[in-house]
């Protein structure tokens, strides 16, 4: 079992991204994973997942979702 990390932000806090592609953007914390030390910020760090067509789904699609970022890459705003 991993030790839970102490995280300096809470759900609902406004944070500013300090590193990475979304640097200097501001968003609200929507989810926290204390085991991995990662957070999900609403409207930040979008990733795409390409889904192939299969027997049930005749057409493929591209789904967009918010990926988690490490809590050390944000600061309170």
From Swiss-Prot:
One of its GO terms (cellular component) is ribonucleoprotein complex. InterPro entries: KOW, Rib_uL2_dom2, Ribosomal_uL24, Ribosomal_uL24_CS, Ribosomal_uL24_KOW, Translation_prot_SH3-like_sf. GO terms for biological process: translation. It comes from the Eukaryota. It is found in: Plastid, Chloroplast. CDD domains: KOW_RPL26. One of its GO terms (molecular function) is structural constituent of ribosome. Keywords: Chloroplast, Plastid, Ribonucleoprotein, Ribosomal protein, RNA-binding, rRNA-binding. The keyword Glycosyltransferase does not apply. HAMAP family: Ribosomal_uL24_B. One of two assembly initiator proteins, it binds directly to the 5'-end of the 23S rRNA, where it nucleates assembly of the 50S subunit. NCBIfam families: rplX_bact. Belongs to the universal ribosomal protein uL24 family. This is Large ribosomal subunit protein uL24c.
